[in-house]
Amino acid sequence: MENDSKKSGISKKRVANLRGNSLIISPQLFDYIKEFNLPVSPVTEQEKASAALKFRLKVANSLDLYLAEVLKSEVLKPLKTPGHYILAGEGGDRVIPESLLYSTGLSIPEEFRAASKLAYKLNAILRSFFKRRGCDLISVSAGFVSMEDKIVINGGFRYSDIMVSHPGQSRRIKDYLIYGKPEDAGNYIKFLNKILD
């Protein structure tokens, strides 16, 4: 991977891996999260896969396209309080109810409670981080890893996991936030990297 980045001319900067849809947390953001003692896994991708929980949580501060369609409301409308939904399935993109999480054996209540506490704490931390930069955190998605009988956040965030808006953003950024179109991903990656610098 390192040789590939040298050949392609991609910067060695720790903010982004532009070849994939992954986001290596910027040192500034990582340090900010660490101040709150939030457990984020430092393990390798292979270790994460073997110990990864079979669900992800998405904490929303504003309505995304899925929620707006379900609630027949406006996309990006702020919520009064953050809400969450559970994502599972092949690509971790299918919404399922909590009861199915247990009845299908994907998780147990203790795991889910620990994961949801971490997700909400991560959301609060990131909201504050981005608010200081004049931005709004629309939503954050997080996966989880079981390490030494503890649940920790999977630190391998993707750009699509952290959705941030800014009053001066371009129409293409807004389109990416609403529709998640792959052709607008490059603009969003640059936008997020600029905020994380």
What are these regions (language model features)?
Residues 1-88, 195-196:
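Active-site loop/lid in soluble adenylation, ligation, and acyl-transfer enzymes
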Residues 52-55, 141-169:
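A short beta-strand motif that forms the metal-chelation/ATP-contact edge
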Residues 107-138:
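A long amphipathic alpha-helix within ATP-dependent nucleotide-binding catalytic cores
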Residues 157-197:
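C-terminal helix-cap and adjacent tail motif
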Residues 19-20, 31, 35, 86-118:
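Short histidine-centered catalytic/ligand-binding loop motif
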Residues 40-44, 128-147:
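A short glycine-rich, hydrophobically flanked beta-strand micro-motif that places a catalytic Asp/Glu
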